[in-house]
Amino acid sequence: MKETVIRKLEGLMERYEEVQALLGEPNVVSDQDKFRALTREYSQLGEVVAGFQQYQQAEADLQAIEEMLSGDDAEMKAMAQEELAEAKQLIERVEAELQVLLLPKDPKDDSNCFLEIRAGAGGDEAAIFAGDLFRMYSKYSERRGWRMEIMSTSDGEHGGYKEIIVRMEGDSVYGIMKFESGGHRVQRVPETESQGRVHTSACTVMVLPEIPEKEIPEINPADLRIDTFRASGAGGQHINKTDSAIRITHIPTGTVVECQDERSQHKNKARAMSVLAARLAQQEEDKRRAEADSTRRSILSTGDRSDRIRTYNYPQGRVSDHRINLTLYRLSEVMEGDLDSLLKPLQQEYQADQLAALSENN
């Protein structure tokens, strides 16, 4: 391993011990924001430190084996020769794992996020599929111990949703869910299809990191048009009595956000502004990423409907992720929330792309 990398790892080990000490200080324990941030850092550093300690032990073991090989004892030399290849393989594996752990982290990966699902081509069947996707993400969220909160819904005429916006909260939510942005296509026989023909419908999914309230940039009020209207759909007796629903239009970009899930107009406006800030920030990020490197393919999609990332084929029980040419014949398990079988290979491919980019830059 390069000396510069070892020095970096030694520095991270020192920081790990420093954070460990800080977490025991009363002024840190009493400051919940600082305590949470340090706890998260301690957990992340712990993985790197454990890997580095394993590397140090493997290097020490290899050195001992090489000393045995240079000795005069024939029996010890034979035993050391058997262990040599295994020791070298272990060092290579641990080095590769440390390389991944040292990849630059996107600070947004630890953020909560907004999940937006919209029905696309396919009419009623697309809306029903949007409902199926929401259920799939809800099941996955339960498995991971995340919390989901519905921000806004527009119901489909025969079930499902024309649009649903959800806030997701928990450990590394955005870092894991960001791979879901893009076009999702379903191939199946709709319940209303009497001839048994397979139809193709589509939905778009957008995953946006939530911007902390303190970091939301000022938006010029002159750039906003705010409309109130009566909420529609299921929701109890208060529905249609007051204009509590909010629609905010960002005039320069044409971005529109609606929120109608709360009874309070003030709460709906605050929620809509939060989603709007996330969308505007993502638009800037997409533009920056495109300008920075238009030649390199990216597993991360912009969430554009033309960017089809996955197909769910019900007759064959198949789900295919087109970004990494992955096909699994376990559609029912995926729809019940087993998304890790798709997301983990995507994360590995993304890390491989990052490593390749670092190598090119170096």
From Swiss-Prot:
It is found in: Cytoplasm. Keywords: Cytoplasm, Methylation, Protein biosynthesis. The modification N5-methylglutamine is found at residue 237. Residues 282-296 have a biased composition (Basic and acidic residues). SUPFAM superfamilies: Release factor. InterPro entries: PCRF, Pep_chain_release_fac_I, Pep_chain_release_fac_I_sf, Prokaryotic/Mito_RF, RF-1. GO terms for molecular function: translation release factor activity, codon specific. Gene3D superfamilies: 3.30.160.20, 3.30.70.1660, 6.10.140.1950. Methylated by PrmC. Methylation increases the termination efficiency of RF1. Its main location: cytoplasm. GO terms for cellular component: cytoplasm. Residues 282-304 are annotated as: Disordered. The keyword Protein biosynthesis applies. The keyword Nucleus does not apply. It holds the Pfam family RF-1. Peptide chain release factor 1 directs the termination of translation in response to the peptide chain termination codons UAG and UAA. HAMAP family: Rel_fac_1. Belongs to the prokaryotic/mitochondrial release factor family. This is Peptide chain release factor 1.
